[in-house]
Curated annotation (Swiss-Prot):
GO MF entries: 4 iron, 4 sulfur cluster binding; metal ion binding; rRNA (adenine(2503)-C2-)-methyltransferase activity; rRNA binding; tRNA (adenine(37)-C2)-methyltransferase activity; tRNA binding
Protein's recorded name: Probable dual-specificity RNA methyltransferase RlmN
BP term (GO), one: rRNA base methylation
Matches recorded under Gene3D superfamilies: 1.10.150.530, Aldolase class I
Family: Belongs to the radical SAM superfamily. RlmN family.
Species annotation: Leptospira interrogans serogroup Icterohaemorrhagiae serovar copenhageni (strain Fiocruz L1-130)
Enzyme Commission numbers on file: 2.1.1.192
InterPro entries: Aldolase_TIM, Methyltransferase_A, RlmN_N, RNA_MTrfase_RlmN, rRNA_lsu_MTrfase_RlmN/Cfr, rSAM
SUPFAM superfamilies assigned: Radical SAM enzymes
Length: 353
């Protein structure tokens, strides 16, 4: 695995951030060093949050010079930081190389001092065209590397001076289109010797990449899993999510059922409410039937963008739709939209200020 992310060419320094302990051990051996050095670097990066070799005070000058020459501790640059009236903060990052490619992460405090969530990106832009999502309007510029995913959390926590209790892969991009780097980053978040977040506090979301879901099941990944459903009917879903062309709703629901059966864990369906598109009695009834067929919960999310003349549902419309879903007998959460005033709410990440 070492060679996968050495850089754009073999003359680049080896990035060490975003590496698992096993990978760091392999790198140290490749460099002619003892494997225990990997544990020291791993602890320094993820527990002490070191960003320069000078901070590794127990390392000899010769060893630090060697690391400086061959390896990098590259970290993200914050090019913009916006704070909402509700305490949510949005961070726009670019890589240390200064390539001009920007992506975003959002710090979402609960307000009561309890839950503190970081919503992170997995790609720069997105290849999919979910019509309610601002990120879909951006040019796709590639997958984020593991260290760019991990460092979103490290940099946000450093700036806000607090630690996240939860991490959600619900920012820019389709996480399962960057499976390797997303799972590697999640494993670092989960590792007790790194960020030490419980698996149930890490949520990976997908628009419905069925082969990625099956890979997730096969690998028995321990993390929470969410599917962006948004319509209970294949034809209706195709009108708002082009992924329906490749992975049909019946295929997706079968994968979801296999997930709950084989991993024995509940799955979350996310449902962006769009008046006149996917709400009303008929759609609610179909969604109830889906929910009754497997172990799930439903997160309903008011539309935050205004494409195609669509509008955000009123409180009354939201309450009415939720009431129609109650016969499903599953947990239903009306997810609030923090950070809407800074374009940091669900579906709004597009580097807009």
């Amino acid at each position: 695995m070492i060679s996968e992310n050495l850089g754009e060419n073999q003359t680049e320094k080896i990035p060490l951030k975003g590496r698992t302990l096993k990978e760091l051990s392999e790198i140290m051996i490749t460099l002619g060093e003892k494997p225990f050095r990997a544990k020291q670097i791993y602890h320094g990066l993820y527990v002490n949050r070191y960003e320069t070799w000078d901070q590794f005070t127990t390392f000899s000058k010769i060893f630090k010079e060697k690391l400086e020459e061959l390896c990098s501790l590259t970290h993200l640059q914050v090019v913009k930081q916006l704070k909402s009236v509700d305490g949510t903060q949005k961070f726009t990052f670019t890589s240390e190389s200064g390539n001009g490619k920007e992506f975003e992460a959002v710090w979402i405090p609960s307000g009561d001092g309890g839950r503190k969530t970081i919503c992170i990106s997995s790609q720069i832009g997105c290849t999919l065209n979910c019509k309610f999502c601002a990120t879909a309007k951006l040019e796709f510029q590639g997958n984020l590397k593991a260290h760019e995913i991990v460092d979103q959390i490290l940099q946000v926590e450093k700036i806000v001076g607090d630690k996240a209790t939860n991490v959600v892969f619900m920012g820019m991009g389709e996480p399962l289109h960057n499976y390797f780097n997303v799972i590697r980053a999640a494993s670092i978040f989960h590792d007790p010797d790194a960020l030490n977040l419980g698996a149930k506090r890490i949520t990976i979301s997908t628009s419905g990449v069925v082969n990625g879901i099956r890979r997730f099941i096969e690998n028995k990944e321990p993390y929470n899993f969410a599917i962006s459903l948004n319509h209970p009917d294949p034809k209706g879903r195709l009108q708002i999510m082009d992924i329906e062309e490749k992975f049909s709703l019946p295929e997706l629901l079968q994968a979801a059922k296999d997930f709950t059966r084989e991993l024995k864990r509940r799955i979350t369906f996310e449902y962006v409410m769009i008046p006149g598109v996917n709400m009303g009695f008929e759609n609610a009834n179909k969604l109830v039937k889906i929910a009754k067929s497997l172990d799930c919960k439903i997160n309903v999310i008011p539309l935050n963008t205004e494409f195609f003349g669509w509008r955000r549902p009123t409180r009354e419309e939201i309450a009415e739709f939720i009431a129609l879903l109650e016969p499903a007998g599953v947990p239903i959460l009306n997810r609030r939209s923090p950070g809407k005033d800074i374009f940091g709410a669900c579906g709004m990440l597009a580097s807009k200020s």
